[in-house]
Amino acid sequence: PVLEMDINLSSDRQIAADSATDLLAKLAQKYKQHNISDTPYLVLKSDNGTYGMGVITVETPDDILNLNRKKRNKLSKGKASLPIEKLILQEGVPSVHSTNNMVSEEVLYQCNGATVGGFFRMHPTKSKKDILNATGMVFKSFCNDSHALCSSEITACGVAQDISKT
């Protein structure tokens, strides 16, 4: 759900926590139905795009109710220091890939339905439930030709070069 709220108001955090309770219950039911052994979690983020800002993971509704000042500040201003007035509460999807011994995710660019590029976003200190779009992230391009250069556990494609500094 999209929530119009001020994260600094305890009454608005209560509304978000209630939504989190409902969503986590629905997800737990689906996880059980599909024999998923992981515990569901949520992501609370700005509805106005993030660039990695204004995003936190939520494991329980109490995480929202008990947000400390630092996390409330993180969720109160977004891109260009504009106030965040709408937050999205959505299912968290853990990263399942590991590249160069780091948790990684594929980032794909598409144009008119065709994939035109992409890369791995990796982070040396984050877990599979963390947001990888954060300070310290590393980028690696997909292989263009031979898999001899691959350093990925993914057999379909891997890593050719470090593009973090390009």
Regions inferred by a protein language model and the residue ranges of each:
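Generic low-polarity alpha-helical segments
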Residues: 5-6, 89, 160
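Phosphate-binding site of ATP-dependent enzymes
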Residues: 25-28, 34-42, 48-142
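Conserved catalytic alpha/beta cores of large enzymes that bind or transform nucleotide phosphates
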Residues: 135-166
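Serine/threonine-rich low-complexity intrinsically disordered regions
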Residues: 19, 68, 127, 145, ...
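A near-ubiquitous, low-amplitude feature marking generic local secondary-structure context
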Residues: 2-10, 47-51, 72
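Generic detection of long, well-ordered alpha-helical segments
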Residues: 10-21, 61, 153, 157, ...
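Conserved N-proximal alpha/beta basic substrate-recognition cap immediately N-terminal to
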Residues: 1-38
